[in-house]
Amino acid sequence: MRKTVSLGDILLYIYDFAVIDARMYMLRADGAALIIDPNENAALLPDLEGVSRAFVYLTHEHYDHISGVNWLKSKLPCDVWCSEICASRLGNIRENLSKTFPFLFLQDKEKYDYVRKELKLPYTCVADHTFAEELRTIWHGHTLYARKAGGHSPGGSLLLLDGRLLFGGDSLLGNGLELKSLGADREAYCTEVLPYVHTLPSETIVCPGHGEITTLGELLPVIEAYITA
């Protein structure tokens, strides 16, 4: 799947991961690309025409959100950013869940066989730049603000673009799975994720790691109904 969504002056490209409903996002500006949670997806390549360098951001360390890092680096120069904790776990096949990824498909033989045969597992990659608590920078006229946000995973973080577009990874899903992963931490979620997103306007657009784009106003009541139950 590949689709584009126009968000005012921003054209957002959305791609899925072949075997699981995980999202890779891309924005273009001035011959550059901002790519969030890359996977190995041939549909991305034509959209990278004219791009000389990519700013790559990882919302957390789980395999389905990092699986395209090495592939992307083989295609063009990249600067890969993530939290320090995320970076420390990218090289551990247990902590990045690539060792156990095939087990997600034990009930679907076709997908299980595909994963075991076609995907490069187990998998590791390396980040080029990290931040401890927060990152503030300008990317081709767009403001980027990232902050550490554990809960779903120890290395989780949130990325806010221009104060209105929030890439939440698996921290903001609305399907009850935010705290169902190995290493999930309810206390961290309630102290690092929820207080921050409550400071943002309800019309903030949320681009989740799985599922469809929504707004904080629509998503937060759903999440809080089961997180704080």
Q: What does each of the following model-derived ranges do?
A:
Residues N41, L45-R136, P221-A225:
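Active-site HxH/HxHxD metal-binding segment of metal-dependent hydrolases
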Residues R2-E49, L158-G169:
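Conserved beta-strand hairpin/beta-sheet module of binuclear metal-dependent hydrolase folds
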Residues Y15-F17, V126-D128, K148-G150:
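Short Gly/Pro-enriched turn/cap motifs at secondary-structure boundaries
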Residues E40-N41, Y63, C86, G151, ...:
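Short, glycine/acidic-enriched loop or turn micro-motifs at the edges of active sites
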Residues A33-I36, F55-L58, K148:
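Short catalytic-loop micro-motif centered on adjacent basic/acidic residues
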Residues A33, R136, T143-T228:
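Metallo-beta-lactamase
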Residues V5-L12, Y114-L119, W139-T143:
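Short Pro/Gly-enriched beta-strand edge/turn motifs at strand-loop
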Residues I10, V51-A54, C78, H142, ...:
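A structural micro-motif
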